[in-house]
Amino acid sequence: MGGVELDMTKKIIGITMGDPASIGPEISAKVLVDKEIYDRCNPLIIGDASTMRKALELIGKEDFQVNAIKDVEDAVFTYGTIDVYDLENADMNLIKPGLVSKEAGEASFQYVDKVIDLALEGKIHATVTNAFNKEAINLAGYNYSGHTEFYAEKTKTEKYTMLLAHENLRVLHVSTHVSLREACDLVKKDRVYDLIVIGEEFCKKIGIENPKIAVAGLNPHSSENGLFGHEEMEEIIPAIQLAKEKGIDVDGPVPPDTIFSKAYGGMYDIVVAMYHDQGHIPLKVLGFVYDKERQVWKEISGVNITLGLPIIRTSVDHGTAFGKAWKGTASELSLKNAIDYAIRLSKK
């Protein structure tokens, strides 16, 4: 790394390539041919160098060099050269674009495992993940419902949460990848309180000095004093009261059908949602733009951030998009958003 120290102004951001059969290699290439990224950070792809070369060819950027390395110290961090921490594990003769496979699952999981190791060892300042496919990693023998759960296990983190962000709308989730029936059972006072605290800490990290937090209800109209359920009275309101006693500026339970409009309009800085779809739907209505004529996603923006970890982890807010894989038409906007947040968080 030419004597560059970890306390340099530009932080080292480790970016996983994602499933080799997905849009991950393409959008990684598209982001790293943008000089602005190199002006703001030192990006390092964790993936397969030969696959990245193919991705550069796909987008017509064969003139860019790929620097395959086995140690972060060997990165050059220079525009025009893409540094790849090369695991040499993606045989594109076996891995077919757009198809689920054990081989792609194995490769993509190894990228995540390695980027976490590099962050824990202090060799990089933040991690950004492209999507892996849950079916593919399970075929490879890794039984995780997503990145978040693996990050938590590997870093030995007990209190963590998924945050989604699009523009000024930021949403935390009490639960994520569980059934709706189970999600209702997971709405507990301690969990809701922990997320309020985590949300306040996150807002302060990104420069919001006095954040205003809103907590969503679980039931329609936040149950109207127990008419439509008891979770608000028994679990959510006690958590909010405890947070207020600790000096946190928090409202709720706010009815779920209006809370996100209020937050997007500027009334709140961050929202605590009770389950996966309650929080994801409003974010994706805003960030995902569908082109009816072309029958494709015109734009995909937003970022997924795991809070509570000892390391920084941001991610694209979409899946592997196998239907668009290796066609040269995938949007890199969400990956740019994720890198932007990683840079901002790594400077705090």
State what each model feature region is.
Residues 130, 137-143, 166, 179, ...:
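Helix-enriched interaction subdomains in cytosolic or periplasmic regions
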Residues 1-2, 181:
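N-terminal leader/targeting segments
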Residues 2-147, 193-214, 218-274, 278-303, ...:
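Contiguous, glycine/small-aliphatic-enriched amphipathic segments in soluble metabolic enzymes
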Residues 149-150, 156-158, 180-202:
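Active-site glycine-rich loop that binds ribose-phosphate moieties when present
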Residues 145-171, 176-179:
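Flexible loop/hinge segments that line or gate small-molecule binding clefts
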Residues 164, 304-306:
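Well-ordered beta-strand positions
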